Amino acid sequence: IVAALDTASRADRARLEREYATHRGGYHTLNREISRYIGLVREFSPGDPELVKGVLELMFSACRDLYDTLETEYGLKVSVSDHIEFEVTFMTRSLSDDHITIAAWANRDGRAPKSLAGRKDNPATYVGTETDQLYHDDNRTPRFIGSTDGTAYKELYPGQKTRIKSSVIWPVVDDEFGLRGTLVVHCDRVGFFTLDSEKLWRETLEPYTKRLALARVLAEKLAEGGTRLDF
């Protein structure tokens, strides 16, 4: 009994340490990125190609930083059998056709999400997805998918559910509560994202959504000046 309690205690400590590190990572990178945002705004000049690249990089860096934090805490620090694989995406409305697209992403292979290939020929690819449903939710309620096995979860290509087992779709809102997109995290572990852990994921994801919201607003300002970003 003592041994069992000790094992449980160690497991609880490891879980709490992991949650703390995951939470801390978001605010650490947010503070670091603020100076980059300030620099971009100060140098704002519609049509500047370097600014265009900078705004896109801000989106991708937010996804990469979140992915790296999750991979470190739930991948590198655990055994191979306990390793959880993640994919992070920023979904938003395209500046070209106003349909939902994936503007930035991060995953183990560094490849664009497979569904984007179909998006080129079918702008309505993401209609009916969790992000699409969140766009129609005035309350901007985060969506937790404990298991993608349910028939209500839209599969974007054959076999997607065999790779994506659980997801969280978090609203990216601006200072006026306007929806600028969603921060989506998928993983290959059933039951990883649940409504019961909403507070943990709110604290974890919000710093990254703030970075994405500001980057999206900057992208819109560029578009108003006649400069289109590639999404």
Please give the residue ranges for each predicted region.
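Intrinsically disordered, low-complexity terminal regulatory regions
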Residues: A4-A104, T227-F231
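Short solvent-exposed loop/turn micro-motifs enriched in small/polar/acidic residues
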Residues: H83, R163-K165
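Residue-level recognition of the N-termini of beta-strands and the immediately preceding loop/turn
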Residues: I84-V88, P113, G181
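Short, flexible loop/turn elements at secondary-structure junctions
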Residues: T92-S94, A106, D174-E176, C187-R189
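Regulatory sensory and allosteric helical modules in signal-transduction proteins
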Residues: T92-T162
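A short, aliphatic-rich beta-strand micro-motif
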Residues: K165-D174
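Juxtadomain coupling helices with adjacent low-complexity linkers
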Residues: L179-F231
